[in-house]
């Protein structure tokens, strides 16, 4: 048996490290656990935690190649975060000029959800518990 326990982290490459770090920490509520500038690669690496659990590895690299942006491009589609109150979460995001899609209802679970984007256009989802 392979023995997977849980997702350890998700790596995100940003075009502007400072902007993305501020978005994930100041707006979404992640905390910066550690940060290092790697001079040889002209690259930043930050480890971000959510509710005390390390979850995102945020990188910057000079001139990263673009990824396909069509809604159903092959590969990782989006990251989803659970929230207790989606209306309050959307209001918080919108107060920081983050545009959210209209809240929808999952026809299978009857739970409410919405999508928004990080500064580089990575789709993120809020899913009400």
UniProtKB/Swiss-Prot annotation:
Span of the signal peptide: none
Coiled-coil ranges from the UniProt annotation: none
Alphabetical UniProt keywords: Metal-binding
InterPro entries named in the record: Fosfomycin_Res_Enzymes, Glyas_Bleomycin-R_OHBP_Dase, Glyas_Fos-R_dOase_dom, VOC, YwkD-like_dom
GO MF annotation list: metal ion binding
VOC domain boundaries: 6-129
Top-level taxon in the UniProt lineage: Bacteria
Family: To B.subtilis YwkD.
Annotated PANTHER family: FOSFOMYCIN RESISTANCE PROTEIN FOSX, LYASE, PUTATIVE-RELATED-RELATED
Name of the protein in its database record: Uncharacterized protein YaeR
């Amino acid at each position: 048996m392979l023995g997977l326990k849980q997702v350890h982290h998700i790596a995100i490459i940003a075009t502007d490290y400072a902007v993305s770090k501020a978005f994930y920490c100041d707006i979404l509520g992640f905390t910066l656990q550690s940060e290092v500038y790697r001079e040889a690669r002209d690259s930043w690496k930050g480890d971000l935690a959510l509710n005390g659990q390390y979850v995102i590895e945020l990188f910057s690299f000079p001139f990263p190649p673009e990824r396909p942006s069509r809604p159903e491009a092959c590969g990782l589609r989006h990251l989803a975060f659970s929230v207790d109150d989606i209306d309050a979460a959307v209001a918080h995001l919108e107060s920081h000029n983050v545009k959210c899609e209209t809240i929808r209802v999952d026809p299978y679970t009857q739970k409410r959800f919405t999508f928004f984007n990080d500064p580089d256009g990575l789709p993120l989802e809020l899913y009400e518990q």
